Regions:
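Domain-level signal for soluble alpha/beta catalytic cores
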Residues: 1-182
Length: 182
């Protein structure tokens, strides 16, 4: 059995266009890594990263443990391009930027996670073109739309719900169609 310790992106997580200081993020991640390693995890999983400043700080903190690191990237589509992002927001950084920012021999895999299902296949292709490491995916469980919809609010062009809106209308068959592309 392998026990993974999970670390998520630094606040403001839902706003990848707002960039925290590297030093603040590093302090936060060092504290989290210290707790996880003290408790005996075998692997560090970095989840929902949508900014390279967070990613660099988390990798620096996790690398000090010598444990394997899996990097999880969250992505959005905007004007036909895939960017690191969450809930319809991005800061202009790409998957290739994230892979370049992940320069540690402890990084053993990359995943696309917590991204719209209709974006995940294209994001995986970009990830595959950016790294030779193993890749994986798991998308959001909600909000699977091919076209913008207007259910309890206005949705953006990527089919994402505005912040605070529930993502509870997933059609399981449509989600499966997307997942088969992965």
């Amino acid at each position: 059995m392998v026990i993974a310790g999970s670390i998520s992106a630094f606040e403001p997580k839902g706003h990848p266009e707002i960039v925290p200081s590297y030093e603040d993020a590093l302090r936060d991640y060092e504290e989290q890594v210290k707790i996880l390693t003290r408790e005996g995890v075998d692997l560090i999983v970095l989840e929902m990263f949508a900014r390279t400043v967070d990613l660099k700080a988390a990798i620096t903190a996790a690398t000090e443990t010598s444990l394997p690191i899996w990097v999880g990237l969250s992505c959005e589509r905007h004007d036909g391009q895939i960017y690191l992002g969450l809930v319809g927001r991005h800061g202009g950084e790409t998957i290739a930027d994230a892979v370049r920012a992940s320069s540690s021999s402890n990084v053993k895999a990359f995943c696309i996670m917590h991204s719209p299902p209709q974006v995940t296949a294209d994001a995986l292709r970009e990830l595959q073109n950016s790294t030779s490491l193993p890749i994986g995916a798991y998308a959001h469980g909600g909000g699977v739309y091919d076209q913008p919809v207007n259910v309890r609010g206005v949705y953006d062009q990527g089919g994402q719900a505005p912040a605070g809106q529930p993502l509870d209308w997933t059609d399981p068959e449509r989600y499966l169609e997307y997942a088969r592309e992965w």
